[in-house]
Amino acid sequence: MSSAPADTPVYRRLRRESLTDSWLSARLGVDTGRLAAMRRAGDLIGVREPGGQAYLYPAWQFQNGKPRPLVPQLVRTAREAGLDDERLYEVMTMRVGLGGEQRLSDLLVAGQDEAVLAAVRSGARP
């Protein structure tokens, strides 16, 4: 994804459904350096904004103003499968099944943790 043009459907969706690091910093009450450390440690999913240095944090990884409990395990599973945060974002926003409207991120929000982890382990198709 990082080599794709900035004006693709994936990037438009990313910008539309994500929180900026400055907004998230204020919301969580931590500085942006701490956010970066959390992202590097695998506690948050952050995707670099196309052509920039800032990161965008998909809103679906948060519940009640905090990261969902599954996020660290999700990131760890993705890394074990060889996926970086950009590819993890792509996988999480793929449609589930043939012709389905739900995305894997919808399953995360619905608490279907095992289905989400299984899809991420496969590295692509939910």
For each feature predicted by the language model, list its residue ranges.
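Non-transmembrane "mature" sequence context
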Residues: 1-126
